[in-house]
Amino acid sequence: MLARTAAIRSLSRTLINSTKAARPAAAALASTRRLASTKAQPTEVSSILEERIKGVSDEANLNETGRVLAVGDGIARVFGLNNIQAEELVEFSSGVKGMALNLEPGQVGIVLFGSDRLVKEGELVKRTGNIVDVPVGPGLLGRVVDALGNPIDGKGPIDAAGRSRAQVKAPGILPRRSVHEPVQTGLKAVDALVPIGRGQRELIIGDRQTGKTAVALDTILNQKRWNNGSDESKKLYCVYVAVGQKRSTVAQLVQTLEQHDAMKYSIIVAATASEAAPLQYLAPFTAASIGEWFRDNGKHALIVYDDLSKQAVAYRQLSLLLRRPPGREAYPGDVFYLHSRLLERAAKLSEKEGSGSLTALPVIETQGGDVSAYIPTNVISITDGQIFLEAELFYKGIRPAINVGLSVSRVGSAAQVKALKQVAGSLKLFLAQYREVAAFAQFGSDLDASTKQTLVRGERLTQLLKQNQYSPLATEEQVPLIYAGVNGHLDGIELSRIGEFESSFLSYLKSNHNELLTEIREKGELSKELLASLKSATESFVATF
């Protein structure tokens, strides 16, 4: 009996021991199966890697560093970096820099500022603790910089007054005041019909190759007459940002500014077509920060965004690669906010804030003249008016090819030079009547005298508004020309001789009535006596022409 009991106990111990031995094997098998099933689910890749990385002894702090899970198309997905901020700069161990755009559970989506070929899977990524910031101050004048504010013109380091974040909040309602000072472009068609004020956002919109950049460039060149002086309140510093353009185009622009002695008061921010999409997305914000330094220090600046269509395309590319939900035309839902937060930074500040201003001239490229597309309508609704350039007018030789009917300035009339407002008041009405009559005149030759008169004057006014590139006119030169056109002094002159009349009339005034031009420039308005003198001078010249 005792022998039987001992045998049963021995068998029990053997079974218990074998069960204990089997448990780890079963657990290992289950773990293997679970791992296999996990591999089949890509969404859990980050958690698997997290477990593995945690298993490595003394791995660097995951709050401050991370490891690359995957890289491609200029996007790196990184595990770790638990304490990272949105839009913070990071540095890869290969030396490439990037910016955190997507903060997701378990991983961070980082856009790369350099080539993604240099970044490898498993590579270490470190936080820098810095949100994207750029150098600002007068030391940038005459320089060409990239989207991060680094000099690319070979003229050595920049003597910056400080650094500013690329993306900052726009001024609120109380620090602003209404637009009341003019930005003179030197273009008769713009200054007379769609005037721009300091602190305004005026959109330049049109198809490719219709002269959009030419309008902006002439505006920059026209500021030379004030920037060469010593009156800081009249100076207008210019910032030009090239987004997605050819490098040869940017080089040509710099050369043009240098030839006309305009580079000394200008800053070029370039994110060319060959550069990464994140840099094209960032460049306008960098330029805005550079311009804001002048605004916030009681000075005046003009910023040209050329063009925001390409910035929207770059942002769409980034958003789709980061797997953000697409909306209309595959743009992300916040593309409106992209442009509104940028353009709201243009403002005229109150006296309490220093009376500085930042004026924006955003450029938008349309396809086939379609201004009702997504991005054009967005920017039209954000801005204070638009200058619409038409391919049809451009090919007819009417340059600048401004469609006067579709172009408007919603706040600029309050800032228009009074003398120009006095003579150009009826110009828009004459041109509107001319367009209406010209459409019907094609179908019939039987026209009454008043219709013929409208056609004659409209043709001459259209011809008068033509202007060669790089030849901006001062206000005191524009006023007599528009006065002559609106008051019918050109009606008897042949259409082909209007250009000749323009140059001869200005030469005549400078030689014989220079005090008249000086008075218009200094007073800025036409008194009764000045108007009588202008009428007399115009009539005497037309009689001899």
Swiss-Prot record:
Residue interval of the organelle targeting sequence: 1-35
One of the GO BP terms on file: proton motive force-driven ATP synthesis
Cross-referenced InterPro entries: ATP_synth_asu-like_sf (IPR023366), ATP_synth_asu_C (IPR000793), ATP_synth_asu_C_sf (IPR038376), ATP_synth_F1_a_nt-bd_dom (IPR033732), ATP_synth_F1_asu (IPR005294), ATPase_a/bsu_AS (IPR020003), ATPase_F1/V1/A1_a/bsu_N (IPR004100), ATPase_F1/V1/A1_a/bsu_N_sf (IPR036121)
Record-linked Gene3D superfamilies: 2.40.30.20, ATP synthase alpha/beta chain, C-terminal domain, P-loop containing nucleotide triphosphate hydrolases
Modified residues (Phosphoserine): 57, 178
Keywords: ATP synthesis, ATP-binding, CF(1), Hydrogen ion transport, Ion transport, Membrane, Mitochondrion, Mitochondrion inner membrane, Nucleotide-binding, Phosphoprotein, Transit peptide, Transport
Main location, first listed in the record: mitochondrion
Pfam families assigned to the protein according to its UniProt record, in alphabetical order: ATP-synt_ab, ATP-synt_ab_C, ATP-synt_ab_N
GO molecular function: ADP binding; ATP binding; proton-transporting ATP synthase activity, rotational mechanism
Positions bound to ATP: 206-213
Cell compartments where the protein resides: Mitochondrion inner membrane
This protein's GO CC annotations: cytosol; mitochondrial inner membrane; mitochondrial intermembrane space; mitochondrial nucleoid; mitochondrion; proton-transporting ATP synthase complex
Site (Required for activity): 407
PROSITE patterns per UniProt: ATPASE_ALPHA_BETA
Result for mutant: residue 383 to I: In ATP1-1; growth-defect
Note: Present with 41500 molecules/cell in log phase SD medium.
Family named by the database record: Belongs to the ATPase alpha/beta chains family.
Oligomeric form and interacting partners: F-type ATPases have 2 components, CF(1) - the catalytic core - and CF(0) - the membrane proton channel. CF(1) has five subunits: alpha(3), beta(3), gamma(1), delta(1), epsilon(1). CF(0) has three main subunits: a, b and c.
Function: Mitochondrial membrane ATP synthase (F(1)F(0) ATP synthase or Complex V) produces ATP from ADP in the presence of a proton gradient across the membrane which is generated by electron transport complexes of the respiratory chain. F-type ATPases consist of two structural domains, F(1) - containing the extramembraneous catalytic core, and F(0) - containing the membrane proton channel, linked together by a central stalk and a peripheral stalk. During catalysis, ATP synthesis in the catalytic domain of F(1) is coupled via a rotary mechanism of the central stalk subunits to proton translocation.
Protein's UniProt name: ATP synthase subunit alpha, mitochondrial
Organism, scientific name: Saccharomyces cerevisiae (strain ATCC 204508 / S288c) (Baker's yeast)
Classification of source organism: Eukaryota, Fungi, Dikarya, Ascomycota, Saccharomycotina
